[in-house]
Amino acid sequence: MNDHTTIAASGGRLSDRELHDLDAYWRAANYLTIGQIYLLDNPLLREPLRLEHVKPRLLGHWGTSPGLSFIYAHLNRAIRLRDANVIYICGPGHGGPAMVANTYLEGTYSELNPDIAMDEQGMRKLFRQFSFPGGIPSHAAPDVPGSIHEGGELGYSLSHAYGAAFDNPDLVVACVVGDGEAETGPLAAAWHSNKFLNPARDGAVLPILHLNGYKIANPTILARIPEDELRALFAGYGYEPLFVAGHEPALMHQRMATVLDDAFDRISAIKHAARNGSGATGSRPEWPMIVLRSPKGWTGPKEVDGLKTEGFWRSHQVPLSGLAENPAHLKLLEEWLKSYRPEELFDAAGAPVASIRATAPQATKRMSANPHANGGLLRRSLELPGLHDHAVSLERPGAVKAESTRVMGSFLRDVMRLNEVAKNFRIVGPDETASNRLQDVFEVTERGWMEKILPEDVHLGREGRVLEILSEHTCQGWLEGYLLTGRHGLFSCYEAFIHIVDSMFNQHAKWLDACREIPWRRPIASLNYLLSSHVWHQEHNGFSHQDPGFIDVALNKKADIVRVYLPPDANTLLCVTDHVLQTWNRINVIVAGKPPSWQWLSMDKAIVHCRAGIGVWDWASTDDGAEPDVVMACAGDVPTLETLAAVQILRQQVPDLRIRVVNVVDLMTLQPKEYHPHGLSDREFDALFTPDKPVIFAYHGYPWTIHRLTYRRTNHDNIHVRGYNEEGTTTTPFDMTVLNGLDRFHIVQSVLDWVPRLKGVRVSLKQAMDSKLLEHRAYICSHGQDMPEILDWKWGQDPDAAPKRPD
């Protein structure tokens, strides 16, 4: 435990008064942190500490906390001196009690939670609630004012920070990166975000690498490598590292104040040069960063039971445990708490003394009250173009072909154009914007890029609003940071590789879910995914690129958070895009193809269909509104195509068969209404799918997903699903469907298998379909492409009337 009694300025940047007040603030934050971890009662130690004052289960992380509060205190000083606009991202989010402590000292916590007042009773509640049933979580969760990053799963702090800084020219995002977190892949990639930050337009990110030396039970790499290697590493990333190292509080305060002043001066100079034309034209600045080396568990017990604790991994969580069994630990805890001299920090009522309160900035300059950290306060609706202005015109279903995502790209181009002044919309992706056919956006913007631009480069520019880096983690982190600070965006990615961010998706979904229970958290714009180059269009890249399972990851989350859309054509894709860009506090997953494909619905019909999310396609059905013999359902663009091709075969071969075609755009409509707000009631579901007729369901993804969504439905036993069965290779597009049994011929066979009255035609027609499958196999192995009747198929023509191609 450190002795704070000899704090003196000793000729540094800080005066004696400044140093005293800064250190008092830090001591108060540390005291409040320990109190949250340990205490149920006696918050100010106004009586001897007894076992009944201590929580029965000790939860929390002390090791990182004093460093987090040390940084927080010094950032407060910088904000006050410069009237700066700063938010704090806590990479080591397990230091949650430190973040709560600082927001309490700033007064924000009590303003938002009036029952936890700044007095002794409020402090008692503050301590009791931490990591306690009915209380608050242990990390920097949404209930912590000023937090936009929980930091439970490590690796995303820096990408969140840069996302927050984009298009926020007056904002400085201080991002504390723990040295454990710095070992993760996502964090390593995120250091390159400085190649995309434009000081003329964007805010600044100040990374603060906190080297306290240890993870849970191991040393950290960056804390052990030589300093010249560490300096070279970050210089290679394009940063100017500024170092602060030590353990003695007075000296560390002076060093940190000096270095932080230097960092803010450099940030101001970079911005001024970029915005006044005095910087090197088009050059990327060398942004400052701070490397803070301080002991893990700083100011805590130096030893416990004769074993080193401060400055070692033993301080990571709870340095003193087993208090009921070891009275010496209880005594040591009391001494530790008293070492901060709480009687100097809190007045008779239990409130922080005036000098500590004055150390914090005021109003929205407080990091815990900055509106950028509650982005819903700043969110403004996007200006959106008219749907009909971008619609694919068609006289009848299947009359024309279009590239669905290219049509979406023209819509997004106009979203960019209409919101150019607001600068609140961006597209991110891992070098797949053009590949996914969204290239029309480059008519109005470029790819953001702060490195050298060569004469032969295309669509690169300093002002570009499309951000591309081949790290899905960084893309997701940028977009989350952008959304969390009140803006809008879209993540475009290959379907198979979006799995790289499965866990980030989970964390964001949990954040949104928790925010719903916090009244002061205002809704933010939804996280929107476009997944293209999907499983049925990856025949050229092969098995590694074929995976529709992200839908299943999404469906694991709470119903009120997640939406999954499978538009069958361009006009329905436009309707879905228009809708998701107007939603908030959701995660919307859109799966759509990019090759030229048949278009089915006019814009007016697409609007009606998408509004319902599901519906009967009367023009493809043969039941004439009567009870059908079979329901042929489809979800996804390729399943829809194959279903309609199968319907066409059946209409010719079994003309009296009553077929009802049901198309699903909004996958969540299949769930019962009591499980999802978009779900159909049982009566509505039965009206579409019947209570007892066979349903042949062609689905984009894994078949069991449909069974999972419909298992409570009346007719579930009659639902027979065809989808992706993990069969793939490099082959032809149609062969991908054949390998997985999703093709038209297998679908026809399913109808024959499950419609009882077709027994008379079953054998001959099934054999005909088997012959077609054999013919298909022989043809592709001979010619390397699909049969002409597949390539030239059209809705409404005789299946045998497709034009023949020469061999």
UniProtKB/Swiss-Prot annotation:
One of its GO terms (molecular function) is aldehyde-lyase activity. One of its GO terms (biological process) is carbohydrate metabolic process. PROSITE patterns: PHOSPHOKETOLASE_1, PHOSPHOKETOLASE_2. Belongs to the XFP family. Keywords: Lyase, Thiamine pyrophosphate. Its cofactor is thiamine diphosphate. Its EC number is 4.1.2.-. Gene3D superfamilies: 3.40.50.920, 3.40.50.970. It holds the Pfam family XFP_C. This is Probable phosphoketolase.
